[in-house]
Regions:
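Loop-to-transmembrane helix junctions at the membrane interface
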Residues: 51-92
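Membrane-water interface at the C-terminal end of transmembrane alpha helices
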Residues: 72, 112-130
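Membrane-embedded alpha-helices of multi-pass membrane proteins, especially ion channels
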Residues: 17-21, 69-72, 93-96
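Alpha-helical transmembrane segments
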Residues: 16-19, 64-67, 116
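Hydrophobic alpha-helical transmembrane segments of integral membrane proteins
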Residues: 78-116
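A cytosolic-side transmembrane-helix exit/cap motif
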Residues: 27-32, 103-109, 125-130
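Hydrophobic transmembrane helix segments
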Residues: 6-60
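N-terminal membrane topogenic signal
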Residues: 1-9, 122-126
């Protein structure tokens, strides 16, 4: 029960971080030598409009994870779904960094929180399997 509480708190912190306007870095080039970096929230449609749909997927899956964790307080069979959603969140974050060079400190913190919750879920699922 403590691990679920920690997991829910970590996911809520991740959602708060994703709502800040410094989550996704996007670089725009006004000329061959000029580059401007602007920052957007994970929930902003600006990165989605420029083809970077990984942040919005990460944000939506994080909300799904929170809902699954809340449902999992009463039912114990949501662990695998939470693990899959978290793995997809981490993969989407890394792909966004690699393909679009959209890495920021907030993005790294969000991915770290996802990783912490994934480790907690895997350890909890292995304890339940015994």
């Amino acid at each position: 029960m403590v691990k679920k509480g920690i997991s829910i708190c970590c996911m809520l912190i991740a959602i708060i971080l994703m709502a800040t306007p410094s989550g996704i870095a996007m670089t725009f080039a006004h000329g061959p030598t000029e580059r401007v970096t602007k920052y957007f929230s994970y929930f902003s449609l600006m990165p989605f409009g420029y083809g970077n749909w990984f942040p919005i997927i990460t944000a939506l899956l994080t909300i799904v994870v929170v809902l699954l964790l809340l449902v999992g307080i009463r039912k114990a069979n949501t662990g695998k779904a939470v693990g899959v959603c978290l793995a997809l969140c981490i993969i989407a974050s890394v792909l966004s960094w690699l393909i679009f060079a959209s890495i920021s400190i907030v993005g790294v913190c969000v991915a770290a929180l996802h990783s912490i919750v994934l480790v907690l879920q895997v350890s909890q699922n292995s304890l339940l399997a015994k």
